[in-house]
């Protein structure tokens, strides 16, 4: 399988445009849930937001095994990333340079930690 670089860049930029400072990740959580469901992932959100004073819980999901033998014999595989971004995390603008580098416009952080991992996972 090869990676579609243009799609990955578009996805990354879309993720960086979602405001997701710590404790205010609701928009990111909703986006991730929507996209994961589109990919046939069974999606859940826990209730940790209530306990920590945030507005979104942890999102987790799984792809069910397609056959009984796979369900019984395959080892689980975990992919993990976080949704929040350090401040200043709102109104981010990604800039794609001619040499392929992606940076912020200088007024905020880019949010590559951890939107880069989320883009790859999706």
Predicted regions and their residues:
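Active-site metal-coordination/substrate-binding segment of hydrolases
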Residues: 55, 62, 73-122
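A non-catalytic alpha/beta surface segment that caps or lines the substrate-entry region
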Residues: 21-73
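Short amphipathic alpha-helical segments, especially helix-boundary/capping motifs
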Residues: 5-10, 36, 94-100
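Catalytic cores of large soluble enzymes that bind and process phosphate-bearing ligands
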Residues: 4, 20-24, 28, 109, ...
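N-terminal capping segment at the start of a domain
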Residues: 1-23
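Predominant activation on well-ordered alpha-helical scaffold segments within soluble catalytic domains
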Residues: 9, 13, 30-33, 118-122
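Bulky hydrophobic/aromatic packing residues
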Residues: 12, 28, 78-80
């Amino acid at each position: 399988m090869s990676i579609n670089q243009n799609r990955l860049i578009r996805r990354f930029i879309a993720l960086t445009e979602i405001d997701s400072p710590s404790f205010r990740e609701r928009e990111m959580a909703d986006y991730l849930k929507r996209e994961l469901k589109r990919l046939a992932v069974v999606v859940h959100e826990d209730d940790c937001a209530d306990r920590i004073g945030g507005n979104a819980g942890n999102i987790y999901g799984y792809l069910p095994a397609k056959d009984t033998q796979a369900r019984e014999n395959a080892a689980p595989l975990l992919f993990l990333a976080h949704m929040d971004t350090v401040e200043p995390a709102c109104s981010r603008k990604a800039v794609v340079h001619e040499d392929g580098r992606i940076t912020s416009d200088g007024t905020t952080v880019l949010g590559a930690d951890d939107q880069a991992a989320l883009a790859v996972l999706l």
